[in-house]
């Protein structure tokens, strides 16, 4: 099975099989946390405006712009906040700067799209392995069009675990991700050095970083199940 890692989304990229979308700080971590808290479904939209179109008393709007909760949204993009949110049985509509856009890029061609993070790394890798017939691709969201150490490190963790599950043929991007993972024995160190973590520190949200650095704490894997309007519908596997 081919194992591929793309460090940022690209218009030219196509995916024939399974894609693990990674935005570890913070969207894909927060997505798993919302499912842990009992959310029925996650609607991932490509923009804040398209998220607001779903605003309703039965819907929870969550997202960020510049790391902070946007106006008229109920919640930000904090996984700590998501885990304790009153979302059981409800739809959570999410829009973020990088993660939701990466998911839409993957969904253009992939057979299966999963949201992965360190938080659900082992469960996400196992499911990807079960679903794949020829390739598992890991798509890093990056930060505003640039590669992110945090996502690349997470891709390395996923790639390593996929290798434990069975034989893989890593392409160059996967080898780079594996090398990054091996360079940082401590997940928190790798994440803390990233531009995404430094941006959170600037807005006083650095407490989210240790949460995002937890490895394999959740079995909740958001899987793409459909669409409504511009939104991708993710549900727990």
Swiss-Prot record:
EC number, UniProt record: 3.1.3.71
Cofactor: Mg(2+)
Keywords: Hydrolase, Magnesium
Catalyzed reaction equations: (2R)-O-phospho-3-sulfolactate + H2O = (2R)-3-sulfolactate + phosphate
GO MF terms, alphabetically ordered: 2-phosphosulfolactate phosphatase activity; magnesium ion binding; sulfopyruvate decarboxylase activity
Pfam family name, one: 2-ph_phosp
S-S pairs: none
Gene3D superfamilies membership: ComB-like
Similarity comment text for this entry: Belongs to the ComB family.
Matches recorded under NCBIfam families: PRK14100.1
Name of this chain's protein: Probable 2-phosphosulfolactate phosphatase
């Amino acid at each position: 099975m081919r194992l591929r890692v793309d460090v940022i989304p690209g218009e030219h990229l196509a995916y024939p099989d399974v894609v693990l979308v990674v935005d570890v700080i913070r969207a894909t971590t927060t997505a798993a946390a919302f499912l842990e808290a009992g959310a029925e479904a996650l609607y991932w939209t490509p923009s804040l405006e398209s998220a607001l179109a779903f605003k309703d008393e039965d819907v929870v709007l969550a997202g960020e712009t510049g790391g902070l909760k946007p106006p008229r949204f109920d919640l930000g993009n904090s996984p700590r906040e998501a885990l304790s949110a009153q979302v059981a049985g409800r739809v959570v509509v999410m829009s973020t700067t990088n993660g939701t856009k990466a998911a839409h890029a993957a969904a253009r061609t992939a057979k299966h799209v999963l949201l992965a993070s360190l938080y659900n790394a082992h469960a996400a890798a196992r499911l990807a392995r079960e679903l794949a017939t020829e390739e598992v691709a890991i798509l890093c969201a990056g930060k505003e069009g640039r590669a992110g150490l945090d996502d690349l490190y997470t891709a390395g963790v996923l790639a390593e675990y996929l290798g434990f599950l069975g034989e893989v043929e890593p392409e160059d991007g996967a080898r780079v991700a594996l090398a990054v993972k091996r360079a940082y024995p401590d997940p928190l160190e790798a994440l803390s050095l990233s531009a995404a973590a430094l941006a959170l520190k600037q807005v006083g949200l650095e407490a989210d970083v240790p949460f995002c650095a937890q490895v394999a704490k959740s079995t909740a894997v958001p899987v793409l199940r459909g669409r409504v309007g511009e939104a991708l519908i993710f549900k727990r596997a």
